[in-house]
Amino acid sequence: SSAASDVYKRQAINSACKGIKSVGLCHSVQGTAEMLAKDLNEKIEDIDYLCAGINHMAFYKKFTKKNGNGGEDLYPKLKKLADDIVSDKITSTRSIGKDSESDKVLHEKVRYEILKRFGYFVTESSEHFAEYVPWFIKQNRQDLIDQYKIPIEEYIDRCENNIKLWDDLEKDMTPIHNQPLKRGKDYASYIMDAVTNNNEVTINGNVMNDGYIDNLPSNCCVEVPCLINSNGNQPQKTGRLPEHLAALMRTNINVQILTAEAALTNKKEHIYHAAMLDPLTGANLSIDEIYAMVDRLI
């Protein structure tokens, strides 16, 4: 299933292989925080947040503006923004112009709808998050896809454009000659700096759930704040998630655990089980159709 995050599968397999130190990385937490800051016309430097969950389905338990007095809760403003974005009165700042990789306008109605219904903002983009739940992409429901402005096959366009970019660079590297080096926003360089030079940093990393989120399974991979320094990676306990958020995550955790189980045990039947339990797949296909789809894929 396209919905099951690959980060969990890799972490589960790594945890089964003793002696491998690893942390799963994704840029959706910091990227979404920056988008929300822009949508609120705030500076990201003034934002403080606490985000926890699973990869591509983590939620901001706290999203505040620093003010020296405990912080201003920005969720009331975000919820007002959600009403305006879902009703097409305004768009997210992410939707201004076409995406540089897929060449499509990427709307954020899905995530703001989720904020309205669940009360918290999720980390993964609308076009991808719609693949994790059964409510937005349905066969013979073009009206829903149009309503939420979901760019179907956007990732295929993104990959094709990136492949063309790499092919062009292979033929001619002059466009990137003398290109200035600039540190990106992904975590890897900050982790190396923290471990090597003890320049302490907190990231959101993916680790097996060793008590870090109380109401998610212990054999799942969670995305939580991680303190990194010369002592290595120290994931932080975040307590319990709101039960409705944990319930939503478990629908995808089921798929992730079974997919990893198939790889670890070499039992093909668990791939069918994972596909049958995938929320979007189950909302669109019968059991026979799911089995046939899996057979075509493998």
Report each predicted region and the residues it spans:
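Short, small-residue-biased leader/transition segments that mark boundaries at the very start
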Residues: 1-8
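An acidic- and aromatic-residue-enriched active-site/binding cleft used to recognize and process polar
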Residues: 5, 27-28, 52-54
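Generic structural marker for isolated residues within well-ordered, non-membrane alpha-helices
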Residues: 10, 33, 294
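Short, surface-exposed basic-aromatic patches at helix termini and helix-loop junctions that form
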Residues: 10-21, 37-44
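Acidic, His- and aromatic-enriched active-site or binding-groove loops in soluble protein domains
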Residues: 18-33
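Long, compositionally biased stretches enriched for glycine and/or charged residues
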Residues: 37-298
